[in-house]
């Protein structure tokens, strides 16, 4: 994010880090847009999105979630990490941690949630889904409803 309250032009031109996330791809383009048609005015949740493209041809979506939705999805992501085994035994949090080339260290992802991981809740067995739901103290049907709504808004 840009620091519009900075005192000098140099400080104002410097971007501040607001989030970090390892994607595993080299992003080479960002554009405003969405993969879905515009919503009707009466829809409950509107999510501003950016599309990105990578050198390998991946198209992805960055969605700016309202605070309550972000907090819910972050809690769900944390619970899912405890109940889902990563590919090759790699933990999701380790895969998404961001390595700083200048600082020479890795930091956990911050201010991002992994939409693919969140959506994978819909593919869990009923037993695992109930365990995740109990972990965040939200009814399984409510989680399904909210994840499906996010899918509809961002795909």
Model-derived regions, located:
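C-terminal scaffolding/assembly regions of large eukaryotic complex subunits
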Residues: 1-155
């Amino acid at each position: 994010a840009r620091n519009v309250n900075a005192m000098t032009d140099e400080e104002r031109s410097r971007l501040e880090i607001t989030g970090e996330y390892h994607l595993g791809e080299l992003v080479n383009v960002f554009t405003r847009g969405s993969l879905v048609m515009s919503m009707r005015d009466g829809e409950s949740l509107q999510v501003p999105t950016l599309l990105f493209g990578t050198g390998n041809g991946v198209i992805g979506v960055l969605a700016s979630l309202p605070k309550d939705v972000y907090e819910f999805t972050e809690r769900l992501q944390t619970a899912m990490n405890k109940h889902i085994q990563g590919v090759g035994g790699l933990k999701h949090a380790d895969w998404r941690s961001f390595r700083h080339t200048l600082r020479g260290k890795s930091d956990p992802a911050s201010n991002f949630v992994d939409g693919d991981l969140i959506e994978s809740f819909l593919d869990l067995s009923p037993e695992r889904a109930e365990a995740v739901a109990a972990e965040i103290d939200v009814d399984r049907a409510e989680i399904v409803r909210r994840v499906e709504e996010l899918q509809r808004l961002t795909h």
